[in-house]
Amino acid sequence: ASRNQKVLLTNTKEEAAGGERSLKVIAPYLHKGESVQVYFKSYYVPQDFQDSRYDPDFSPIVYPGDKITVMIKASNSSQQMTVCPFIRDRITGQYIKLEKAALHLSDPLQNTQNDKFQKLEFQIPTYEDILIEEIGWEFYAPIDNNMGPFTVFLDDVEIIQNPNYMIHFDKLPMERWNVLHTCVAGLTWLRGKVELEDGWLAVSGCSAPAEAYTGEIHWKNYRFQSIIRPGKGDTHRILFRVQGAMRCYAAGFMKDNRLVLWKKEKDYRVLCQCPFTWESNKEYKLTVEVNGNKTVIYVNDHAYLEWEDKENAYNEGCIGFGTEGSSRTFFKEYEICMLE
């Protein structure tokens, strides 16, 4: 999509960096200093839809820490332009320009033009409390010249996943699709009730597992931690390497004072466990490190469980928060980073 000007976007065979096609962006006229934004939606909100008959929920595709690359080629009349990548935050609505990654489509010092595709790459900085709604590129006309027409080609956009961020749940808004359908921004969910209560994410159910998910299904080796507070009931857990409603691992607390590692293959089963005296309404920092087929579980920075899954191991997946039975679990925040 594009904004700021009347712009034509078309898929074309005229140019290509790789393959046979690219995205052609045309603006008929730009005054000096004006700009055009071309962007990709990483996350959708209710205002993007005319109705909610499908009752969707969304998690972002792009996260802080990810690297974005794109191939860009300008027409001869557009090579005096500068392009600057940006992201847009769903929570604040703020546009964050990554000016250090800006690219001149020609070399103004050498007075040369470039008639080939150029690679522009940028890494999104580590942030707290941000949901990336858009990633994009802003094209600026020279400050001393009007320009028209403006034409560039974009190709080979790649998202290289390297999430490194933290979310406090009291910063997240609710997405309100209609009177009956609301959800916490950035989360999808399975069963039960998922809501914000006094700044905490609250997940509750009555029989089958109630779960909320976020992240990208191709995340592989990472460290994931959350501040968790068991409420009512006897099953309270965080989820990792989630591959949909039927497959994931989980770590957390269970009845009879146990710390447990589960594996879900349609239903949950215990992989390993150890004694751990936990209390309702007490906060714990629950952490999992997953690397290859090995998992280590920490509580308050102390390692309690280690496991190597040698049978149909799940090697990638997103993250989540869950409970089971007549339980209610609270989560204050979470943090994730990739392992080296």
Annotate each language-model stretch with its function.
Residues 90-132, 272-284, 288:
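Extracellular carbohydrate recognition and processing domains
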Residues 70, 84-85, 118-156, 285-289, ...:
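Extracellular beta-strand ligand-recognition surfaces/modules
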Residues 8-46, 188-211, 258-260, 317:
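Short carbohydrate-recognition loop motifs
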Residues 49-55, 77-78, 203-268:
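Secretory/extracellular carbohydrate-interaction modules
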Residues 147-168, 312-340:
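Ligand-recognition surfaces built from glycine- and aromatic
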Residues 34-38, 77-89, 133-134, 233-243:
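Beta-strand acidic-aromatic groove motif in beta-rich domains, primarily in extracellular
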Residues 1-7, 12-14, 152-188:
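Extracellular carbohydrate-recognition regions
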Residues 1, 23, 42-85, 118-124, ...:
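Extra-cytoplasmic beta-strand recognition segments
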